[in-house]
Amino acid sequence: MYPTLENIKQLAQKKEYRRIPLCRELYADRYTPVEVMRTLRKASRHCYLLESASQTEVWGRYSFLGYEPSMEITCTDGTLKIRRTDAQGKAEETVKQVTHPGDTLREIIREYKTPVMENMPPFTGGLVGYFSYDYIKYSEPKLKLEDKEQQDFRDMDLMLFDQVIVFDHFKQKVLLITGVMTDDLEASYEVAVKKLEEMAQLIRNGEHMEFEPLKLESEIRPKFPKEKYADMVEKAKHYIKEGDIFQVVLSNPMRAKATGSLFDTYRVLRATNPSPYMFYFSSDDIELAGASPETLAKLENGTLSTFPLAGTRPRGKTREEDKALEEGLLKDEKELAEHNMLVDLGRNDIGKISKIGTVKVEKYLCVERFSHVMHLGSTVTGIIRDDKDAVDAVDAILPAGTLSGAPKFRACQIIEELEQSKRGIYGGAIGYLDFAGNLDTCIAIRLVYKKNGEICIRSGAGIVADSVPEKEFQECCNKARAVVQAIEQAQEGLE
């Protein structure tokens, strides 16, 4: 178990931190993240699993799991709700009206301020969950977004996890982490030691939850058939011709009635579509599973990064075909123009909160391959100003230009007009804000969510002046294919 009580006392003497992470290690050869997730879901309805793989399909070092959040913070149309759960499981909810939930998030993060520990994973506790696409209303209050289909999406749903289970795949260890609060240090240390033992016992001996298999009760159908989507593209091209925008992303939701869980869908996605951001999230409101290729915002020790992906081709069936598709992508003027626009937008977004002269494009026009598609990718970074933080980073970048358009504000207005439905999680952000002030979120794409007895997969295409409507409709289908196939395979049953 580390750090020692003496080391914790030394850190606490600095009066800078409210919480110090305490870690206990188990050997991982008896466990898997999927198996442990079954145990956690039995213990708590509110739980998550975050994993990653590189574009070369090399498995990421860490898998993060959490359960039994001590707090859930949600915000919908300015109504902020905080539900606190004590050690005995008793819940208490407070409700208030806010113009922006960010101040409340900052207060909570300050309450648990934690040092970055060199010998621990990058995430040792924090807020995990999502910001919806519609969260933009708080940074852009003049943008009017309506819930025309009455799906009752939350603008934000974040849960505070003080206890974290981490699979370190390099060391082949399971790391159990909880926090020691510095205001009553010795008593808190004893509580933390006891909590780590409870976590170890849960992993060793906890009862498994058998997730109910997903069963579709209707066919997965797009909201907009090809003809209707083509009309939307033509209207968007009219706005481009008139000079309102340069580019806009129009999405097409696919829905079906369904029962059961999305966990097996997640299991298929992690095997067939390994991605930099893979996630399973369960709450009393929604269940979601996905494998996103694209970072929305990553803030680490003051450096803010975003990684726009724009420009798409399907993967080839042979190595030669794949190479030919890559060469075609790199020569496609429409795709290159779209990508350059969105790199510029990423620079502008990061520049809003960065120190002058620090914004730069570190990687440019790299071809990133995934299971079903390849994309053009670039990396934009900046060093944030001293008066800015992770909450400001979300405000500055959400929604990404790759999911909205350029100029962003007008593109969002046109999306609202043409799509005629609240996007909800799609195009938002999924990930964490940790107690050290860092942030790691992906763009909420390549996912399926289940809410109110219905599943939804949503995908979009970037519309520019010379877009061909039928090709843009097909691009939406290509992007949704990995998730649809995962759902179909999960329905057949997994061993």
Range-by-range predicted roles:
Residues M1-E495:
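Extended alpha-helical targeting/anchoring segments
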